[in-house]
Every structure is written in C-alpha cells, then in structure tokens.
From Swiss-Prot:
Molecular function GO terms recorded: ATP binding; UDP-N-acetylmuramate-L-alanine ligase activity
Species assigned in the record: Aromatoleum aromaticum (strain DSM 19018 / LMG 30748 / EbN1) (Azoarcus sp. (strain EbN1))
Cellular compartment(s): Cytoplasm
Role of this protein: Cell wall formation.
Protein name: UDP-N-acetylmuramate--L-alanine ligase
Amino acid sequence: MKHKVKRIHFVGIGGAGMSGIAEVLANLGFMVSGSDLGENAATRRLAALGVQVRVGHAAENVAGADAVVISTAVRNDNPEVVAARSRHVPIVPRAQMLAELMRLKHGIAIAGTHGKTTTTSLVASILAEGGMDPTFVIGGKLNAAGANARLGKGDFLVAEADESDASFLLLTPVISVITNIDADHMDTYGHDFARLKQAFVDFLQHLPFYGVAVLCEDDPHVRSIMPLVSKQVVRYGLSESANIRAENVRAEGGRMLFDVVRTNGSVSRLPIELNLPGVHNVLNALAAIAVATEVQVPDAAIIKALAEFRGVGRRFQRYGEVALRDAEGTPQGSCTLIDDYGHHPVEMAATLAAARGAFPGRRLVLAFQPHRYTRTRDCFEDFVKVLSTVDALLLAEVYAAGEAPVVAADGRSLARAIRVAGKVEPVFVEDIDEMPATVLAAVRDGDVVITMGAGSIGAVPGKLASSEELV
C-alpha cells in the first residue's frame, strides 16, 4: 500500500517540526513539496535538496499530492487543506507522519516541558559519535550537522515528542525520556494539571514490554508519576536515589564539569566535560547519557561527544562579540551576544542562571518577546519575577502566534507590573523591528546581551551580529 504514496505535500513546511520530517522523507526518495508564508533558512535548505517550495498558500499547491501533512498551527480553512479535503487527499497530522517514520526504526522519543531540543540533540550527537549513524528529527538546528534532521543508516530514530497538542501519544518508541513536567499548553488539557500528567503516563505506556522509560528523578512532577509506570525505569538527576547521577558539578568558562555515577548492579564513574553552561544542561546531558548507556554506546564516545558538542540553534547560541559605537562612529568597546528560544519562566530562569555562571560579574541585558497571550496570562506573576532578575530589560510586545489579544496580558501590562515590582526599569519596545537599535542604544562595553523568545525576535540577533558589527 505504501508504494502508492509518491508525492507528499507539507503545509507550513518552513516550521521547525515540519521541515525536519520533510527532509527525511525527501532523503527516503519521496517527492516532497510544501508551502509557507515566507522563506527562511529551512525552506532554502529544502529547496537545495530538490524539494519544491512555494511561498504562500493556494489550492493549486496540493495538485497531484498523495498526502498532505499539517501541523496544529494550520487552520482548517487554509486553502490547501480545503482543497485536499475536497479531493479526498489524506490529511496527515505532523505527529502521525513522525510516528510512521518511527515505525521504520527503533524510536527514541524525548518528551518534557523544557529541554527537549537540547536533550534530543545530545542523544543524536552521542549516538553519531558512537558509530550508530542515527536518524534524527529535532526542533532546532544541530550546529554540527547544519540541519535539524538527517536520515541515517543506523537502527535508531531520535526525535522530540511534543506534548503541546498531546500528539506525542501517537508515537511508539522503544526508549522514552521525560525531562520535566510543567504547566504549559494548558488549553490542550482543559487547564487541568492532573490531565497533563496523565498524558505523560499514557505516553510511557506506549513503550513495548522491553522498552525503557528514562525519567528525571529531580523533577517532582515526573517523580510523582513513577509509581504509575509499568515499564522499566531508569532515573537520572543530581539526587542520591538516581541510577545515573552527577557529582562534583562545577561551572568553568561556559562549560560544566561533573562526574557521572552509574548504578546498575555495579557502580561506574565517568568524568564529563560538557560544552554547555548551566545545571539544567547537566540534567539534559544525564538524560542523554542514560539513553546512550541503554543502547551500549562506548564510554569514550559519550565523553568525546559531550566535550565537543557544538550546540543547537537558538539554545544559548553564542554570536560572539558585537562592536559598540557612538553616534559619530567612534568605537565604544563591545558586548557579548547570546540568543535563546526560552519562552516559559522556568526555562528562562535556567538560561539566565547559566549566563550568570558563564559570565560572573557582568551586566546582563535581556531583550525578551513574550510568546502567546494565553501563556503571558497564565504565567504572568512568574514572568514578572524572572524578568526582574536581569540588570536591564528591553520588553517587546507579545508575539501572538495566531491568538487573539487577552486583556491585561499584553507587553505593556507586563512592563507596568515589572515597573511596579521595582527591581528593574523595563523599556517597552512596541515594534520588534526597533529592537536592534534599542539594544545598541542601551548596552555598554562589557555587557552580556541575551535575545530571548520563540517568536519574531529570532531575527534580531542576526541583525545585531551583522558582519560589519562583529569584532
């Protein structure tokens, strides 16, 4: 039956989750096409691989397609979806297509509210270093590979498992990781945290009888579901009760050094030098080490992969030093520029703590764009708290991501609440296009500047770090 499917069309092909699956399918030999509202690095990469990419959505784009893949961001009234439905062309959710790919391999699925992309990238890097040539589909660009997806010849497929729309319940991996569980995407679960936790339990129950659940012992919500899991469980974390734990954790020049103690009948120790900052990344690395241990990657490969890990796009991505000049063009020193995808208060706090550890004593300037009005509303007080910890704050208007505005959950309301809290004086930037100039006007020599958010602020660091401004 599968041989009947020759051409697969993606609506919104430039998205992080969609482009990776499209690339793997193209490399498997399928004719792949897609459309998006604009070009980006992902669409250009796909076009170079021979994928037909069109800018704009139109009914004629799906002509000749045997299947149409959509993400949850695509509306039912999209002209391509309407055309596919009228022609009785199967409309396939993105997660279902990922599940089909996972059936061809031994799946390793990384779930959790925070840390999925980094952990997935670490697992893929370790397996690659161990000679296992994995297939991977990641939500961000793996810098060492220059892409967010790759078709490998090995037995394993490593992918993120997305809980935001409960689509991770479609996956059938042999190893499942849960990094943490936090209150996010609560609309999907009727604003019921118990339902969210149950979804993670159900995700683990999809493991086969020989499968393994790799769970973070340090996260209280993950720990609370462990008694409900009827599969083999490997616990990782800093806790003494973890099967795979880190000891002697210390920060050194933007890297984390620690010893891994593995307890599984016998005890073994592994010295690790992780080329990422922050204790949260130590936990991500422990999850990856747990997976690598299960699939018997040699210790030498684990050590080498973590020491040489080159990071993931928009996850504490370092752009280097940006030259500062006054109005007359006179050099005024430089600032360090970092970009991060963080958009939930918990992950933002972890990133800011990592920055403090990597650059002790330096002034921290944050340019932040909130993502979604509903998240801003639901996490309002937590946003006020975490945003008040920086030395200077440039706050953009909320990136709607298709949502209608919510009263008292916009950027101005957030800026007002932060101002009332009294720890930092925010500068509100209504137009994101004005953010680069606002940043350059606010920074001083020696500052560390972090651009952060999941929306259009992702274009800001590139404008700041243009070739003539880098030193």
